[in-house]
């Protein structure tokens, strides 16, 4: 059996066992929950949630306890879940992801993409922040917004932040994930429309990250203090100075007004210039536009060097962003995140982070899969659906050579 798979499994399970040694840190009622001897201890509970699939909780319990007559009931399982804080799985996700050693980079950068995706849950009106009422012909539902940073080269999620429908904010989520990122390598971030805010640029620059972000309006003629050329393709440099004061207020206080000055309105969030601040913030970037094969054009903003990343390179680079869209689909349908086993917010959060852990575990398993095995005239890749299934069974205790199975089910690259 492959040593890497064994090591990954032992790393994950040892983290769960270590968390079980301090149940009060993850219990809703510390000192009372998880103190009595039960069949469903904290480590067993986390293990069961982690390996749940679309089958009912009762069937999962029967499988774990090998069809014993004293198998805990589904009701007992739910009662134990309600004692566990979602923070347990969030911490497990971060610890396990930090333990991984991805090797692939893009020109020396960790190539990340940021995006958000909605997750629909059963109706639970008690949670007003996520509840959306239906109509006379349709029941209401609850909606969660999942924000994530995804490593496009290595196929793993590096961070996740879950928000509720009525309190969501992708800009705020991005800034929070950037600020708390533990990545030590240079980072290059790709993002779609909606992330082109000054505050986002500033947080990225403060961390020393590079970015390539699509602008909201591809046909716009004015952006970030400059008039854009009336051309299907261009590459220009912009440099503006941001401030909170009006030009009159700056004159009254004896502050010289820069030529490329842009005032930020009080309702525009910018963490480095609080409302009323007299400080200035200089922002510079490249704005590029290129034509697509269908004749349309896209406009992007970046702080990448023009010599290292000319216009054709940016066009190819931005196309890589689609990888995070594919990953969300795999997360929901291959890993099975859409098969929620509860409608309560705390239990849904448990399952969301469990799905991300299983996703990263499955991807890390595939890193050493030999895709050149056998004879084929096509380039091939691992069947991720098979990888998830085998990883889940491997975590459940199956003694299998995962990589031998994966070699037999390679798919041609389309």
Question: What are the roles of these predicted feature ranges?
Answer:
Residues 1-55, 63, 68, 72, ...:
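Single, function-defining residue in the core of a domain
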Residues 110-112:
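Conserved beta-strand elements of the Class I
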């Amino acid at each position: 059996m492959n040593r890497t798979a064994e090591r990954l499994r032992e790393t994950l399970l040892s983290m769960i066992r270590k968390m079980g040694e301090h149940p009060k840190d993850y219990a809703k009622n510390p000192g009372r929950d998880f103190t009595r001897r039960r069949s469903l201890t904290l480590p067993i509970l986390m293990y069961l949630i982690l390996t749940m699939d679309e089958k009912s909780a009762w069937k999962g319990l029967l499988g774990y306890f090998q069809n014993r007559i004293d198998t805990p009931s589904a009701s007992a399982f739910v009662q134990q879940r309600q004692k566990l804080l979602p923070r347990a799985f969030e911490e497990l996700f971060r610890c396990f992801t930090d333990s991984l050693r991805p090797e692939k980079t893009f020109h020396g950068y960790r190539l990340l993409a940021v995006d958000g995706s909605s997750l629909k849950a059963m109706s639970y009106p008690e949670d007003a922040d996520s509840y959306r009422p239906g109509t006379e012909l349709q029941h209401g539902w609850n909606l969660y917004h999942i924000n994530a940073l995804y490593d496009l080269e290595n196929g793993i999620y590096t961070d996740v932040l879950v928000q509720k429908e009525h309190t969501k904010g992708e800009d705020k989520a991005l800034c929070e994930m950037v600020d708390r990122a533990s990545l030590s390598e240079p980072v290059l971030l790709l993002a779609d429309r909606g992330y082109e805010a000054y505050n986002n640029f500033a947080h990225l620059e403060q961390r020393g990250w590079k970015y390539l972000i699509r602008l909201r309006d591809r046909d716009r003629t004015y952006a970030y203090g400059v008039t854009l050329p009336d051309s299907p393709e261009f590459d220009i440099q912009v440099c503006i100075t941001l401030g909170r004061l009006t030009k009159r207020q700056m004159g009254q206080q004896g502050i010289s007004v820069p030529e490329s000055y842009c005032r930020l309105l009080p309702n525009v969030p910018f963490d480095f210039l609080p409302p009323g601040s007299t400080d200035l913030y200089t922002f510079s970037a490249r704005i590029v536009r290129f034509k697509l094969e269908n004749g349309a054009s896209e406009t992007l903003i970046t702080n990448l060097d023009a010599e290292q990343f000319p216009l054709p390179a940016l066009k190819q680079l931005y196309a890589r962003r689609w990888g995070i869209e594919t990953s969300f689909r795999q997360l929901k349908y291959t890993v099975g995140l859409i098969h929620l086993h509860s409608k309560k917010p705390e239990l849904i959060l448990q399952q969301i982070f469990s799905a991300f852990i299983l996703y990263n575990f499955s991807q890390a398993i595939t890193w050493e899969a030999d895709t050149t095995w056998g004879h084929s005239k096509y380039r091939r890749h691992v069947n991720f659906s098979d990888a998830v299934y085998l990883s889940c069974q491997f975590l459940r205790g199956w003694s299998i050579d995962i990589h031998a199975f994966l070699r037999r089910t390679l798919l041609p690259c389309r």
